[in-house]
Each structure stands twice: as C-alpha cells, then as structure tokens.
C-alpha cells in the first residue's frame, strides 16, 4: 500500500518482507508453524535452539539485505515522501493488551508450558475482551490459503498410510538419515515440493527424539528452504496473495533470482555450522 501511494517499485520490498520473515523466524521455536511443531516433538530446549540458530539467522538477514540492495539498487535509490493517514484509527487499549498477552505467551512457553495451549488461551482472551467485533476479524482470514494447506495435510496423511515411507526406508537405512548433509538436502527438497510444514510432518519419522542436532537442523533448514521458491513457505504465499489483491504480480522468476542463490549459500553455511562448528 505504501509503495503504491509513493509510486515506487514494490517488488524489492515484497521480496524483502517474504524472505526476511522466513529467515528471521528460523531462530526460534515460536517463529513459524513448523518450528512450533518441532519444538513440541523434540526435547531441544528453546534457549539452546536460539543460541544455535540465531547466528545463521542474523547472517541470512545481512545476506538478504546485500542481495536485494545489489539487484534493485536503482529502484531503492529513488527518493520519496510519505505522509501518514491522520484518519487511521489505532486502538491503544487493544494494542497494549495484545503486547502484554504476547509477552505472557512467550514467557509461559520459555518456562515449559505447551505453546499451543498458551497461544490458544491468549488468542481466546483477546477475542473475548477486544472492542472489535469477531466478524471483522473473520473477514481477514484467508480461507483459500487454509483450504490449500488442509489439502496438503490430507496428501501427507495419504503418503503416511500408503507405505511410501517404508519403501523409502528400504533404500535409505535409518543410519544414513542421521547424516546432516543428506538429511538437510531432503528437508530442502521436500519443503519446496509440499511446503515446509508438511515436510516436517514427513521427516519427523526419521529423527529419534534424543537426536537434538537433527531436530535443530530440520527447524533451521526447513525454514530457510522456504526462500528457495515461491511455494516454499506459507509466508511467501501470503505476501503474494496480498500483493495480488493490490494488483501487484510477483513472478517466480523475480523470486528465484534472489531466493535461489541466497538459499543455496545459506544452506551450505548451515550444514557446515551443524556438522563441524556447533
């Protein structure tokens, strides 16, 4: 919206939002849906994972900034002036309540409470006590996106019941899956075929609960892999859908020119990090 108002090319900003949300969310267990799932399935402490993933995540954000600045340097050098809409309504009371509830959810999760329960109670509290009618909240739900993911989860359930995983196991013995490079490649490829959340649902069967380093690698690499293609993560799809509603088309080619080399390079660094350094 802001880019359209000031008449600048919105593509670099949209790419930055989508890719930065993937890279930034990789450093915690509450940053995205697949990491929440991994946090609940594994025995990895949230603080330990943050210390392990944060350096890669911060490095990735720097690399993203440099890549977009180089690719779109002419578009980003354009000067503009933006005047905010004075008629915009800010619910200060609701904003303060939301910040407090969010902080409490994070604190409860860090001390050991189940994230899904604390987040659900927090959301229910805000929905009940908000001065905004629930109907207005429901209007902003992207049901098309939800239906698409429901379909993906149904496909994953079909794969689980079909015996395909047993067939894969016959070609790839479990001890091979403990090799970080091979496991990382599988996570990256699967994340861009069925998206990262369904990929985690499939790959969880190959990781013993006590293999903390593999859980950490899966959380970090399945999220970073979301930047490889447009279909790699839900964040990409949300950004593209919102842009489309504003008449802006983000093409796969535009995304690949930044996302593909960035993801490959950052994935190699991540594998080296987990294999030799961390």
Give a label for each model feature.
Residues 1-26, 37, 200-220, 250, ...:
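Hydrophobic transmembrane alpha-helices that form the pore/transport pathway of multi-pass ion
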Residues 27, 53-61, 113-123, 220-235:
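Structural signature of hydrophobic alpha-helical transmembrane segments
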Residues 29-35, 117, 192-203, 230-238:
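Transmembrane helix boundary and interhelical junction motifs in multipass membrane proteins
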